[in-house]
């Protein structure tokens, strides 16, 4: 007999197991947070003179907003990226990263929803999410670093732009691969929050 996790109509039956769609979304958000953390920490290209690094984690943040929706995506992208800074010893950046990456996922998800509702191309929405990443990462980190380090913060702008462009390209490549997975496609196409 299948296990009923919630007693409402908002559940999905799969191979004898019943799963609430909210629980499924939470599980996917946790997976995206873990992916964002690992993608940020696994491939690091140091940026000279800044003490920072370029990484592919931004692509996961963008895709979290698109696939999970703005709210769950914001939580997954922000928490996963901030965990990477925490584990990596970049303690001062943990709250900054939480906010900036959370906003990237939030805005990417909102753009995706708006474009999908108006019948526009979903792939264009992914690219616009990548552009959002470039603006928020380069601008957001510059503003925060300006308060921390003064005018020397400008040195990080080119590296943050390169990181954002990398996030755009990687998310554009990964989107069709992920959307081909039925559960991921269903989550992305039905996303409401």
Label the model's feature ranges.
Residues 2-193:
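Loop-helix junctions at membrane interfaces
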């Amino acid at each position: 007999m299948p296990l009923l996790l919630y007693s409402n109509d908002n559940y999905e039956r799969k191979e004898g197991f019943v799963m609430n769609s909210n629980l499924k979304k939470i599980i996917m958000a946790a997976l995206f947070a873990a992916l964002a953390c690992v993608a940020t920490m696994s491939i690091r290209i140091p940026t000279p003179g800044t003490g920072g690094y370029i990484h592919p984690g931004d692509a996961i943040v963008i895709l979290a907003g698109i696939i999970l929706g703005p709210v769950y995506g914001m939580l997954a992208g922000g928490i996963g990226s901030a965990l990477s800074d925490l584990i990596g010893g970049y303690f001062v950046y943990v709250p900054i990263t939480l906010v900036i990456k959370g906003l990237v996922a939030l805005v990417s998800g909102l753009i995706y929803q708006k474009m999908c509702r108006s019948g526009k191309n979903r792939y264009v929405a992914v690219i616009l999410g990548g552009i959002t990443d470039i603006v928020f990462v380069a601008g957001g980190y510059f503003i925060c670093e300006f308060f921390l380090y003064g005018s020397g913060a400008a040195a990080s702008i080119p590296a943050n732009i390169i990181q954002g462009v990398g996030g755009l390209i990687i998310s554009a490549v990964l989107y069709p691969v992920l959307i081909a997975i039925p559960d991921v496609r269903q989550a992305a196409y039905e996303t409401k929050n």
